[in-house]
Amino acid sequence: MGFPTKIQLIKRAASEQWYVNFPSAVAQAMELQKGEVVEWVIEDKQRLTLKRTNQPVELEKKNYALSLTDELDSLFNECHPAFSSHRAWAKSRELMYGELTCLGRHTVTGMLTASGNQFCDWSGAYRLFSEQRVDLPRIMQVVQANVLKEASCLPYVVAHLDDTVIKKTGRLIPGTAWRRDPLGPRFQTNLVWGQRFIQLSLALPREGQIGQSRAIPVDFHHCPTAVRPRQPAEEERWQAYREEKKAARLSHQGSERIALLRRALDDQGYRDKELVVGVDGSYTNKEVLRKLPRGTTLVGRVRKDTKLYGLPQAKPGSGRKCVYGTRLPTPEEVRRSDQVPWQQVEAWAAGKAHRFDIKVVRDARWRSAGPQNLTLVVVRPLGYRLSKGSRMLYREPAYLICTETGLDIQAILQAYLWRWEIEVDFREEKTLLGCGQAQVRNPNSAESLPAFVAALYGLLHLASHRAAASPNAAMLPRPKWYRREDAKRITTGDLLNNLRAQLWAKAANQNFSDFVNSQIKTRSLRNEPSYNGSAAFYVRN
């Protein structure tokens, strides 16, 4: 049985090419597979014979790139057990995308509007938090487990601890009080009305022990101050107030959060990994240093006039043993002294690797730390120029202590430098995601809604880290004023713009690259271009 077949001969200078129009009836009858190799045999000028080979069909698997929304959905699916029902999970998923794509104030109604639910019942969104239908610590556990999995290249776990104040205006919001304004000038102590939270973040390095890092929130704890009883009050009420006041101190709360993180690491199978916690000077005190759990190292700043001591000499006989030896020079005196030599250590800071000059004094003791041995690290300030021809300026020197004398100096310095990322977290959570803008007065909602925003911030950056590993990651073209460097990390604002573009591309059933044109050309002045895409997907906050 024969089938008419069209054959075209193309003669070239070095070869001849034959193009055969394969009959579809033959392909259907023979049940050919995609990728199967066949042979055409020319028997005469009027006849071609098709022969099938027995070669196995090997199809190349396409490398489908997972987008930011795919990774975000995958992570949020892991959080399903943290919700009281599937309906609560679905509602929270809508609020998540509404929070991350909202262009106005990040209130609950703003989340509902951004997710397309402005014409639906809004009370269910408020009840998610007021009736505690979301287990936020369990969501943080999912974030923590994924960060530890992605940061397995580190032989230890690096964490950052700090507190922040969320400004509020309502006097009836639970947990609000007058706080010291950290943004006030040095010569004047200003006060602001707001809530106080403690955040613990884990470092998610991009490339090993020396390189860029993100601080992913794994704990966002509300720390209200104790309410002073009014006069006249019974003595029992005053005694209870004093106990609540001690328990509400930030140093006490921070010590408890560190111990809680250490227990969580042990439960997740990381008992053998050391936990290195970077803190600022407000947590380098007796309350935190003397209550460190097993397997935990603290790296914190101290004053330049801190009084340190050497190890005591062993004395024979009975009696009380000495805990502190002779006085050592203060950190500032160590920096100025020539007896302790400078040594260079490489670490990542301010967008690139630097070589820092440091001085190290081991086996020092401090009365706030008790009998444990400490390591003092003095960091010489880096020089920088505001312009190419300007004079050299210097930053402030840093004085650090570490509770583990055997830890590598490079690890101590890098853990301290990575701690700055938690300050970036606070700024972006407040400015970009509107943490604390939700207008709620229920005690549960006032505590859980800011923590929900912090958890979404961690999920967003974790999804970005996983999506960036794909070679074909779909990303918006960067503006022209950005530096064309692959080492530059994606900002949180760019992540939100990419997420918004990917969601709108799915809704409009368009190709991702069709949204933004790098050049807009018009045939006449009357043809005005539309800048809606740039306005929506290149928002600058």
List each language-model region with its residue ranges:
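Single, function-defining residue in the core of a domain
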Residues: K61-H80, L172, Q209-N541
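Active-site-proximal, Lys/Arg-enriched surface segment
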Residues: S130-P229, V361
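Structural motif
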Residues: F83-K91, F187-W193, Q439-P450
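Short beta-strand-centered segments at strand-helix junctions
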Residues: Q17-E31
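Gly/Ser/Thr-rich loops at beta-strand to alpha-helix junctions
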Residues: C102, V165-K167, D280-N285
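Long, compositionally biased stretches
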Residues: M1-A14, Q33-E60, F356-W366, G370-Q372
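Gly/serine-rich nucleotide phosphate-binding loop at the start of the catalytic core
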Residues: K61-S130, L136
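Short hydrophobic beta-strand that contains or immediately precedes a catalytic carboxylate
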Residues: N21-F22, H160-L161, G278, Y416
